[in-house]
Amino acid sequence: MVTIAAIIYEPGNSIKNKTGTWRTFRPILDNEKCVKCENCYIFCPEGAIQEDENGNFKIDYDYCKGCLICMNECPVNAITKVREEK
């Protein structure tokens, strides 16, 4: 028997599974450069970017997989990358 796709036994359970260790690159957000366009927040497929009480965006590295979509969508280059250390 061949499994064609993953089986999701409990929809919405990804919040229980920290996936931050999958990264090769870590996005670094510079709130000084950030213009609060929310592109990073909108395009993050993991919902790992949230706005704090001061209106600054923060990356939750427990769930960030390092796809760097946030960096590619930032119009002012406020997000850079660094290689993740082992």
Swiss-Prot record:
Specify the superkingdom: Archaea
Q: Does the keyword Signal apply?
A: no
Residues annotated as binding [4Fe-4S] cluster 1:
C34, C37, C40, C74
Which sites bind [4Fe-4S] cluster 2? C44, C64, C67, C70
Gene Ontology MF: a single term: metal ion binding
What residues does the 4Fe-4S ferredoxin-type domain cover?
25-54, 55-84
What cofactors does the UniProt entry give for this protein? [4Fe-4S] cluster
Q: Name one Pfam family in it.
A: Fer4_21
The UniProt entry, under InterPro entries, shows:
4Fe4S_Fe-S-bd, 4Fe4S_Fe_S_CS, PorD_KorD, Pyruvate_synthase_PorD
Give UniProt keywords alphabetically.
4Fe-4S, Electron transport, Iron, Iron-sulfur, Metal-binding, Repeat, Transport
- Cofactor annotation remark: Binds 2 [4Fe-4S] clusters.
Q: Among its keywords, does the record have Electron transport? A: yes
Gene3D superfamilies per UniProt: 3.30.70.20
Can you state the subunit structure given in the record?
Heterotetramer of one alpha, one beta, one delta and one gamma chain.
PANTHER family for this protein: PYRUVATE SYNTHASE SUBUNIT PORD
Protein name per UniProt: Pyruvate synthase subunit PorD
Q: Please tell me the species this chain comes from.
A: Methanocaldococcus jannaschii (strain ATCC 43067 / DSM 2661 / JAL-1 / JCM 10045 / NBRC 100440) (Methanococcus jannaschii)
